[in-house]
């Protein structure tokens, strides 16, 4: 199980890919934590994304390659036209799930420059699109019906700046297993 470097209490975060690590290691006969010094130290809401070193049977440490970086191309004319139409339909306080690619990134950039306020994040993949909204003061998560105040996501993919944001401000995030993020019941609780 890939984990972040431990904090002073010996707790580690479960990294940028949260598909089902907790479920996997809670059901495994042998648990090996691989400490990756490059992973953000996210520990989740109420420790939902936290593990203690004592929960591992073995711990492996070593040097790691930089995290994968996602780059974005300039938006095409079609991306821009689609994004304009989408942005027109998004009300203040909307909870967003943005994918990865030209259109979602263009939507986020247009929202960042718009008069929309108090947007929320409940998404499979948190990316630089959400970072752009946060930097513009648009991403507050204030009006979310669940996980109020937190950006909820299952996978992080983007720039080093995105990973640094996750590492430096972990109190803003609720990284969660795929069954939590994509639960139809949970999604149905939001407007």
Question: Where on the chain are the PLM-derived regions?
Answer:
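Conserved alpha/beta enzyme-core scaffold
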Residues: 1-191
């Amino acid at each position: 199980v890939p984990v972040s470097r431990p904090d002073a209490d010996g707790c580690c975060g479960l990294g940028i890919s949260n598909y089902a690590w907790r479920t996997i290691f809670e059901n495994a006969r042998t648990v090996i934590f691989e400490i990756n010094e490059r992973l953000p130290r996210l520990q989740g809401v109420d420790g939902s994304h936290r593990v203690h070193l004592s929960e591992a049977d073995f711990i492996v440490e070593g040097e790691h390659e930089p995290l994968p970086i996602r780059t974005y191309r300039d938006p095409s004319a079609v991306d821009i036209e689609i994004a304009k139409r989408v942005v027109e339909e998004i009300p203040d306080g909307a909870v967003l799930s943005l994918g990865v690619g030209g259109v979602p990134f263009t939507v986020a950039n247009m929202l960042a420059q718009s008069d929309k306020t108090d947007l929320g994040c409940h998404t499979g993949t948190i990316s630089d699109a959400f970072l752009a909204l946060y930097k513009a003061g648009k991403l507050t998560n204030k009006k979310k019906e669940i996980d109020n105040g937190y950006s909820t996501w299952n996978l992080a993919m983007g720039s080093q700046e995105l990973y640094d944001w996750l590492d430096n401000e972990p109190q803003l995030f609720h990284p969660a297993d795929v069954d939590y993020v994509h639960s139809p019941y949970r999604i149905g609780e939001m407007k």
